[in-house]
């Protein structure tokens, strides 16, 4: 008999004389002649109550249906006389699929700390909080794809293994088949002659450059996949492996870029609020009581826009004593970003036209020769959510910028060649998907919105 998901059982329009459900026991309560099971299969936040009568075959195995055990139940879906749930299941048969020793099962009825749950990442999705977080993650991922499909973008798959550093920061994970290439290896490229690719290979930090290639043919594209940064940063906002959403648009400028970022963020938030109401409600009640109002505020108003120069002036005039003083030419720190989004504008704000010295070589040089057509979208509680720019389409300017930043133009011959044959204005951005999830849920640590976090000194699971 086909299994019915608990979500579908709870949303049934009529009783059912024969239903099959499977799931994990959350709790069991024994009474005279009956046992009451709370069962969850991950399809939704709400458990379904199962009544096991001592007169039925199901009662024979009820003693082993301890917290964490998995069971297969057949019975009747009937109206529940209790409050808070329309339906319950009266079990006729129950098969114990997997035992869970109550003495050693790591998830007990008490509320566990996030720090403890990170040590058992293989079991934490069974908790209410993390089950909800990962259902929201799945729905938000679907929303990203839906948004771009509805707006005429093509999804392209960019390489995970790369021979180039998009950001020019050098903080990349090396990939090699050589037995002893490490930090002490010679810097010359010849050391990699015997390697698999015959050259140095790393995990990608961004799919942007390859997405630009595809946009120069397909017009509007996006990539959505894992990226890797070998930054030794143990902060709540950084992970060594995370997912990036990276659209690229031909025949577009910085204005188009900022508008696309705003539209996408609002679309995903609206979609998740519509399709994950119960899961979001958990976070609104127990994680961040201001979450609902914050998300509604984001949807209700146009995002603010301010130049980097104006942002520095706002920070200086704020009277706030920042740990890092706001000075023109210095990058904005998280404390600056959050002040602008949370306290000054009280909503998301796009900061644009940054000094060229603090931005990457591919960002279009503005006419003033001092700034580039870059933008960062800052949001409350998070800081930077999106970073993007109009890309430099002029060959001579791009070559000069690469050399100015001490990089080798030969490494980007293919990227430069795009500017020789039908070059066109284009723009794009990158959004850290986990940071969007932090915004959606109110969760304060990136380790808790990705199933298996990769951070310095942590590579379990």
UniProtKB/Swiss-Prot annotation:
GO terms for biological process: asparaginyl-tRNA aminoacylation. SUPFAM superfamilies: Class II aaRS and biotin synthetases (SSF55681), Nucleic acid-binding proteins (SSF50249). Its EC number is 6.1.1.22. Pfam families: tRNA-synt_2, tRNA_anti-codon. It comes from the Bacteria. InterPro entries: Aa-tRNA-synt_II, aa-tRNA-synth_II, aa-tRNA-synth_II/BPL/LPL, Asn-tRNA-ligase, Asp/Asn-tRNA-synth_IIb, NA-bd_OB-fold, NA-bd_OB_tRNA. Keywords: Aminoacyl-tRNA synthetase, ATP-binding, Cytoplasm, Ligase, Nucleotide-binding, Protein biosynthesis. It is found in: Cytoplasm. The keyword Nucleotidyltransferase does not apply. One of its GO terms (cellular component) is cytoplasm. It catalyses: tRNA(Asn) + L-asparagine + ATP = L-asparaginyl-tRNA(Asn) + AMP + diphosphate + H(+). One of its GO terms (molecular function) is ATP binding. CDD domains: AsxRS_core, EcAsnRS_like_N. Belongs to the class-II aminoacyl-tRNA synthetase family. Homodimer. This is Asparagine--tRNA ligase. The gene is asnS.
């Amino acid at each position: 008999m086909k299994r019915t998901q608990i979500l579908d059982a709870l949303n049934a329009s009529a009783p059912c004389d024969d239903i099959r459900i499977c799931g994990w026991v959350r709790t069991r309560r024994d009474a005279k002649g009956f046992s009451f099971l709370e069962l969850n299969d991950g399809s939704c936040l709400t458990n379904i109550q199962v009544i096991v009568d001592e007169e039925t075959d199901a009662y024979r195995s009820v003693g082993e249906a301890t917290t964490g055990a998995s069971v297969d139940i057949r019975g009747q879906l009937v109206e529940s006389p209790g409050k808070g749930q329309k339906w319950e299941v009266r079990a006729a048969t129950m098969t114990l699929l997997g035992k869970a020793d109550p003495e050693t099962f790591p998830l007990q009825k008490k509320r566990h700390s996030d720090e403890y749950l990170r040590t058992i990442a293989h079991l934490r999705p069974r908790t209410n909080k993390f089950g909800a977080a990962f259902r929201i993650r799945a729905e938000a991922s679907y929303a990203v794809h839906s948004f771009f499909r509805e707006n005429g973008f093509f999804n392209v798959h960019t390489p995970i293994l790369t021979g180039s550093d998009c950001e020019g920061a050098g903080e990349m994970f090396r990939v090699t088949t050589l037995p002893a290439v490490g930090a002490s290896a010679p810097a010359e490229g010849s050391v990699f002659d015997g390697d698999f690719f015959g050259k140095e290979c790393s995990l990608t930090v961004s799919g942007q450059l390859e997405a630009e290639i595809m946009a120069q043919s397909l017009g509007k594209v996006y990539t959505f996949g894992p990226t890797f940064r070998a930054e030794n940063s143990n902060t709540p906002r950084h992970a060594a492996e995370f997912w990036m959403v990276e659209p690229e648009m031909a025949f577009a400028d910085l204005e188009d870029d900022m508008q696309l970022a705003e539209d996408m963020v609002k679309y995903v938030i609206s979609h998740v609020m519509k399709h994950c109401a119960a899961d979001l409600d958990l976070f609104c009640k127990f994680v961040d009581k201001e979450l609902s109002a914050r998300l509604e505020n984001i949807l209700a108003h146009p995002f603010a826009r301010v130049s980097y120069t104006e942002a520095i002036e706002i920070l200086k005039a704020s009277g706030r004593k920042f740990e890092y003083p706001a000075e023109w030419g210095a990058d904005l720190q998280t404390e600056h970003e959050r002040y602008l989004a949370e306290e000054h504008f009280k909503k998301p704000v796009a900061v644009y036209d940054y000094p060229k010295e603090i931005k990457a070589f591919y960002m279009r040089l503005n006419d003033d020769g001092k700034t580039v057509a870059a933008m960062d979208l800052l949001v409350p509680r998070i800081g930077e959510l999106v970073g993007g720019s109009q890309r430099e389409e002029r060959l001579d300017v791009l070559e000069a910028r690469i050399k100015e930043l001490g990089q080798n133009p030969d490494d980007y011959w293919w990227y430069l060649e795009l500017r020789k044959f039908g070059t066109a204005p284009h723009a794009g951005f990158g959004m850290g998907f986990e940071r969007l999830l932090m915004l959606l849920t109110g969760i304060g640590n990136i380790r808790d919105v990705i199933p298996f976090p990769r951070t310095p000194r942590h590579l379990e699971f």
